[in-house]
């Protein structure tokens, strides 16, 4: 079962744009029974260093976007819950989406020309320890070792995520 925890990240709380603060408030308002956790870049690195030490060499050499991608997989793997990008406005309670599920990923319909991006990794939920999350983190690390010529969307982002979910479905 997916725990009622919402995870979001941004550089730091002070630099959060006003429009994103409205999004954060909408998430909290629609989900009052959920624990809300905000992580700064500094806190993200600290968690990776403390709880996922084997990822630190790759994490430290990643771009900020790649670090954010890797962190979201790791934090939900560790604690379970809902990950949501900070620029997402929430209009309903998450309970309707996650019910008794162990893993939920958004699916963007109507993007045939962008089928590589079919599954969203800007919004997903899982129980702690779900295998898709540690596999995503391991792929981020392995893909990063291929070097800077690999496109971020394929290395750590929605293309990698979509490939992984498709593989695990079959």
Where in the sequence are the language-model features?
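Small-residue hinge/turn detector
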Residues: 69-81
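Glycosyltransferase-associated regions of secretory-pathway enzymes
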Residues: 1-68, 84-170
